Amino acid sequence: EIILGREAEKPPVFYRQKERKHTNLLMPELSETTDCVEKYLQGRGIHPVIIRYCLDNKLLFESADYHNAMFVGYDKDGKARYGALRSTVSSYKGELTGSDKHFSFFLEGKPNAEHIHVFESAIDLLSFATLALLAGRDWKSETYLSLAGVFQTKRENVVPVALSRFLDEHPSVCKIHLHLDNDAVGRGAVKGIVGGLQGKYQVYDEPPAHGKDVNDELKIRVGLMRERKERERT
């Protein structure tokens, strides 16, 4: 579904975090292997080729202490500025100390891209890339951005800081594909982004066709998960 703004003359309304002194991202000691992270992500349906790409490009790491998966985002100078943590053995989620959400996890495709695909989490991002790979598309030519989570807010027309920063630094982007969750928070975030951008971009609302999020859709596609209605009938 495409949502076209009507007021292109108005500038986008970006909600920015309060100015704060830049702090360094504190990276923990790394594991000598990435076996736990690779096993965990493959169990979520992520293709090994995409996992290896992220490892080789220092976008994905495994911590030595708890063997958490770490998804790292960089600024335009190549400095690590954000780290999302995901346990490989529990439901724990967190962020590295010193993380700045302006620089959340992303995969950049061809230079001067016109399209960007936007997700709530790094795992949803990698799930979409996997679906593209399985469909025979050139997944590395696309540009993908994780918002590092979306939240309910009392403010209207809020553009997440990760997206506003990315758009500022990539003026070639004119089409935004939102692949946010099929829940109240995800739907509210779509509404806020569309309102906040004020018609400056073509925004496409493209939630997962199956399941709550893009990873659910991937797991259903590859047989790792059944849709809720199918489970209820069994």
Predicted features along the sequence, with ranges:
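Charged interaction scaffolds used for protein-protein
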Residues: 3-4, 185
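Accessory, often N-terminal, substrate/partner-engagement and coupling regions
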Residues: 9-10
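Basic, glycine-enriched DNA-binding surface that flanks or lies within the catalytic cores of DNA
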Residues: 13-104, 108-110
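Terminal peptide-recognition signature
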Residues: 41, 71, 78, 120, ...
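Short active-site oxyanion
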Residues: 112-117, 175-176
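Conserved mixed alpha/beta catalytic, RNA-binding, or beta-rich assembly cores of soluble enzyme
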Residues: 118-123, 149-152
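Acidic, divalent-metal-coordinating active-site segment for phosphoryl/phosphodiester hydrolysis
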Residues: 123-124, 189
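TOPRIM fold recognition
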Residues: 130-234
